[in-house]
Structure formats: C-alpha cells, structure tokens
Amino acid sequence: MTPPSLSLTASAPSSSASSDVLVLGARSDDEGVIVLSAGARDGLAAELAAVGFSGGKDELVRLPGAEGGPALAVVGMPDERDEDAFRYAAGTAVRQLAGVQRVALALPTETDAQLGATLEGAALGAYAFTEYREKTKAGVKEPVAEIQVVGRSDEGDALIARAATVAEAAGLVKDLVNAPPLDLYPATFAERVEALAADLPVSVEVWDETRLAADGFGGILGVGQGSARPPRLVKVVYSPDSATRHLALVGKGITFDSGGLSLKPASGMVGMKYDMTGAAAVLAAALAAAKLRLPVRVTAWLCLAENMPSGSAIRPNDVLRIRGGRTVEVLNTDAEGRLVLADGLVAAGEERPDAIVDVATLTGAAEVALGTRYAAVMGSDDLVADVIAAAKASGELLWPMPLAGELRATIASDVADIANANPGNTAGGMLLAGVFLQEFIGRSGDAEDSPRIPWAHLDIAGPAKGPSAPYGFTGKGPSAVSVRALIRLAEDFSGR
C-alpha cells in the first residue's frame, strides 16, 4: 500500500483548505471532561460531556468545526504521558478517520519522544489492504493520505523519517502476511525480497533446493519436501562500514502450514498463511535498519517452506540431519517451524554475531498461555531483558517465559539426537519448543566450553493473527507484531 505523507506544522490549521479534520486529545475524571490539547475552543469540554465522551482508549468523537475550518475529532487519552499513550491515541484517531483525506493532530506533546510517537502511531493507523478486492473494493474506506502533526522540533526531519520507516516496515509485514499462499510461496517470497532490496545498501543470497541439499540444510528441505513448491533459505545482510556490532535475526517462514501428514483439521488450516509472519518481520526489520542507515550489522535469515502432505512428505519417525550434523527425529510433522528454525539458527551462529533473535508463530500453547496481545520471549537473560526493553519503548507487549531445562528429557529420541515433539505430552508446549531451539545455538568461540551466543526466542503465535476487532492503530488482520521491537533493538545495538 502507499504510505501516508507525514509533516510537522507549528500551529493547528484553522482552514479546511489545509486539513479536513483536526484531532485533539481529552480525558475525563470524576470532575468531568478535561481537554488536553492547547487552543481548544471555549465550551468544548461541555460539548464532549453532553455527547457522553468518557476519554477512554479507542474512543473518538467527531464534532463540527468552526465556520470555514476543519471538522473536529477528539480522541481519548490517559492521564499518563508516556510515548505509547501518544502512539496509541494518534493511531486510534487516524485508523477511525479512514475515508478522510487530510488529518491534523494537535495532541499535547511536550518532548521529541512524544512527537515521534505521535507521528509513528498516526502512520501505523493509515493502513488498508485491498489488493484482492474487486467488486467490494469501493466499500473499503481509503486510509488517511496526508497527516500533519502539530509540534516543533530541531529533529523534525529525523522524527518524520523514522516514523515513516517504522510504518513502512509494519505495512510490509502486513502486505506479505495478507497475500494468499497461492501467490506467496517460498520462491516468490525470495523474489519479493530481491526486489525490495534492490535500491537499498543490502545484499541478498538465496539457497534453492539444490543448494540447500548441498549445504546440509536438512530441516528446511525436510519440511518442504511434501510440497510441489520447493523451499528456500534467504539471507539478507545490511553491513555498513561503521558497524561494530552484529545482530542476527532468524524468521520462521512457513508460507502455508497444513500440518503435513500430521494433518490439521480443516478449521485449523484457516489462517495458516500467517505462519510466515516471523520471516516477514525479520526481513522488514533488516530493511528498516538499512533505510535508517543504522551503524550496526543486521543479518536476517528467512527460513521458507510450505508444509504439505503428499507421497513425498516427511513421515513421523523420519530422521532429519540439521545443518551442522545434529539429527532430529520427527514425531509430529505439524511441529515443523522448529525444524526450519534449527537450520537458520545454526547458520546464523556460524557467523558468531553478538546476538541472535528468532521470531516465529511457533506454538498454539503460546496463545493459550498469553492470549492474542502478548508475545512470549525466552532465552539468554541479558538479551531477553534488552528485547523486552526495546518492546516496551516501541509499544509492543512481550512477556518473559522460562527456558525449562528439565523438560529436555521430554523430547529425547530413541534413535536420533533429539525429537521435535512428544505427541503424548500436553504440558509446556511453548517451553518445549524453546528448549528444542536452544540445542542449535552456537558458541561464541572455537573452544567447546566457550559461552553460547546470546539468544532470544520470540513466540508470536498469539498476536500475529491480529484482533477480531480493531484497536489503537491495529486493524483487523495481521498485526506486524515484533517488527517495531526489532527495529528498536537494532537501534539500541547501534548505540543510536
């Protein structure tokens, strides 16, 4: 989709010639409505009270504007003035004002951080996906095309550039996830990556099925061998000369997950095009780092396969040899994400980056435990703390989970180094997946007792699917969860 134009303006527009709607912020308490934005017209608080405005999150009230001026909209804001309050309020307003061409936001910003969050939230709220609509396209309101934010900053250009880049990254994830698996499969995904990278200072390397076999990527090959559309591994590298640290990102990219021979029920297959969200997120984060010219090396590994049943599909009890030689007995072909990630994690570790973060819609257990707003994170304590801090700063919800080493025996194999699942076990499925992945994290040096490379695993299965009802800047459909946190983490790694 085409992103909105963003700009800063020193004062709120007074004419409908420059803006169609002016958005203000307000809240309410026991004493009534409190308008937070400066310059509001006299009596506005009473008008809001008369129409039942409560100041809650996701609340937007539209009122007539002054004669000759833009219409007025008032969005609910909490009393807290953290960055996320501005991001959320701006996104709420812009999302709900779809169908309006030009919007100006005059929220009570006082700092560059609040101003940047307002720009970001507004841009995130201006998303729609209509590529596959024909007869019904006219019924979908166009997102806001022009966004002005009232505020001044010496860093205005940088704030606008960052907000636009973050919103473009989230939009890319949503576009990729929204695409049907008929059109987005491993080969076309790889082609899309090459096209996206063409004008950026990044390199792209693609492993087809022949090269995957030659280089020992048995997990990706095994998962993909049941499909008529063969798998791919895509490596995206942004490596500026100024970089002193290296962040590796590994994404699960199952373009459609039928479950393989361990077939899902029909209802369980609906939405399984979302199973490549992790790969889309790490791709978008790497491209964003390049657009922002961050002084940090970012390598994204996209592990792409389609998990389908056929006469050539892997079977329960088959043994796969992962890159590096470790063997895995497949006891559940629907626990395929960890198999492709294992290859990606080993490959990422061979370069000995400063940290590895993998992102995957990995387990239904994560959604059962944490619902559809929170993603899980587990791994090395210090890196997990860094990832959580990046998520908090970017307005994403992560919850730390333990790496339960005592569960390792649960996925022991009678014939291989490890099993990918324990079909009779119903407890701790999310934790078991993390314990499995930990087996494939490399060491930071040649010695066998060298410490393992810091690693964090994000299980985004719950929030990736998006809400059944929109909220904030997030509409129905894919949420682009984790991409903003990954961009912030790359910024933190760069020292910017």
Swiss-Prot record:
Which E.C. number(s) belong to this protein? Answer: 3.4.11.1, 3.4.11.10
Q: Where is the active site?
A: K264, R338
SUPFAM superfamilies on file: Macro domain-like (SSF52949), Zn-dependent exopeptidases (SSF53187)
Cofactor dependence is on: Mn(2+)
Q: Supply one GO CC term from the record.
A: cytoplasm
Reaction catalysis annotation = Release of an N-terminal amino acid, Xaa-|-Yaa-, in which Xaa is preferably Leu, but may be other amino acids including Pro although not Arg or Lys, and Yaa may be Pro. Amino acid amides and methyl esters are also readily hydrolyzed, but rates on arylamides are exceedingly low; Release of an N-terminal amino acid, preferentially leucine, but not glutamic or aspartic acids
Q: What is the main EC category here?
A: hydrolase
User: Predominant location of this chain?
Assistant: cytoplasm
UniProt keyword annotations, A-Z: Aminopeptidase, Cytoplasm, Hydrolase, Manganese, Metal-binding, Protease
Q: Which Gene3D superfamilies match?
A: Leucine Aminopeptidase, subunit E, domain 1, Zn peptidases
Task: List residues binding Mn(2+) 2.
Answer: K252, D257, D275, E336
Q: Which residues hold Mn(2+) 1? A: D257, D334, E336
Q: What's an example Gene Ontology biological process for this entry?
A: proteolysis
Q: Name one GO molecular function term.
A: manganese ion binding
As for family, the record states: Belongs to the peptidase M17 family.
Role noted for this protein: Presumably involved in the processing and regular turnover of intracellular proteins. Catalyzes the removal of unsubstituted N-terminal amino acids from various peptides.
What name does the UniProt record give this protein? Probable cytosol aminopeptidase
The scientific name of the source species is Leifsonia xyli subsp. xyli (strain CTCB07)
Tell me what gene encodes this.
pepA
